[in-house]
Amino acid sequence: MDINIGYPMPLDDNILTEDVENASNTVSESDYGSHTMVIYQDLDILREFYSYYVKKRIEERNEVIQIVPFYETEDSVRKSLSEGHFSIDVEKWEKDKKSLIIVDSLEKYYGDETVESSYISSRKLVKDAKMMGKSGVSVLGDMGAFHYKHRIQELVDYELFLPSHYDIDMKGICLYHQKDFNRLSVGQKQKVIDHHEISLKI
């Protein structure tokens, strides 16, 4: 006899598994304001994802992109973006066009900024992008810094502080290594998933 005693649905039912290109297109085609979570299996997959996304948004959509890596250095991100099928002229977009910003996640999340000031700086980034004639901003931030600092509850609080939908021309893309996501409790996972408009696994 099948008795429903109110257990929640499995978490994976709320997460869409896609290949890298489809996942990138899903995020790219979402409206400004979207708050997305992307869980990635390894660095190679992540690099392919952000390389595809950055090329499309910078070259085709006239957007400013901020990448906030944790499991690789700023220079290794530049190297990944300048090589492979989806390569771009990193120096041109980073220095000349001011469309690419790469900031280490420990600096962004544990530097001088608080959670509140980090959000304020994102709003300022959108304002500056608009003044340059850009369509908007995408921020791809790796949440690994919180796990490195053993501040899991702080990570959940940070996610819940951010709006589920931004009221500015920005896409917030929270990147989670699968092993970091696995460290969250079931309740924490559910809160984080529910707070994002789109949850993807690549």
Please place each PLM-identified region on the residue numbering.
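Non-catalytic regulatory/interaction regions at protein termini and inter-domain linkers
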Residues: 1-202
